[in-house]
Design a protein with these regions (language model features):
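Metallo-beta-lactamase
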Residues: 1-29, 77-95
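Short, solvent-exposed coil/turn elements at secondary-structure transition points
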Residues: 16-18, 33, 104
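Active-site-proximal beta-strand elements of phosphoester/diester hydrolases
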Residues: 25-31, 51-54
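Active-site glycine- and acidic-residue-rich loops that bind
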Residues: 28-40
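Cap/insert and terminal regions of metallo-dependent hydrolase folds
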Residues: 37-116
Length: 116
C-alpha cells in the first residue's frame, strides 16, 4: 500500500481485475480510455443491477453503435471494441443496466429516480 498525499492512514493499493468491496459492490478495471479507470457493478435490493462505466464508455449511442470517442483517448479503436464486448458480457451475466459516464439523455431519463 502507498500513502496518498503523505497522509499515513490514507492509503491505496493498485488493483487489476475485480475487487469485491461487499456482496453487492464490485469494482473492476476497465481496459480503455486511460490506465486505472475503474468501473462499478452495484447490485441493488429493489432495482436490479447496474454497471457504471465512468469514462470508459461515454454514451448509450457509443455503446450500441460501437462508436469510439475521438482523439487519442484509447490506444486503438480495438481497445474500445474489446471493452464494449466485456461490458456487454457483464451486462448479460448480471442482468444489469449500464450507466454511461457522459450521456445527457440518460441523465434526463434517470434524473429524478431513486435507486435502493
Amino acid at each position: 500500500k502507498q500513502n496518498i498525499c503523505d497522509i499515513p492512514r490514507l492509503t491505496y493499493a493498485p488493483m487489476n481485475g475485480e475487487l469485491k468491496l461487499a456482496d453487492d459492490l464490485i469494482l473492476f478495471t476497465q481496459r480503455c480510455h486511460t490506465p486505472g479507470v475503474i468501473g462499478i457493478l452495484a447490485k441493488t435490493k429493489n432495482n436490479g443491477n447496474f454497471i457504471f462505466t465512468s469514462d470508459a464508455i461515454y454514451t448509450k449511442e457509443s455503446y450500441e453503435n460501437l462508436t469510439p470517442p475521438g482523439g487519442t483517448i484509447n490506444k486503438t479503436d480495438d481497445e474500445f471494441f474489446d471493452h464494449v464486448k466485456t461490458i456487454k458480457d457483464m451486462q448479460k451475466k448480471y442482468n444489469a443496466q449500464v450507466v454511461f459516464g457522459h450521456d445527457p439523455n440518460q441523465y434526463k431519463e434517470w434524473g429524478n429516480k431513486v435507486v435502493d
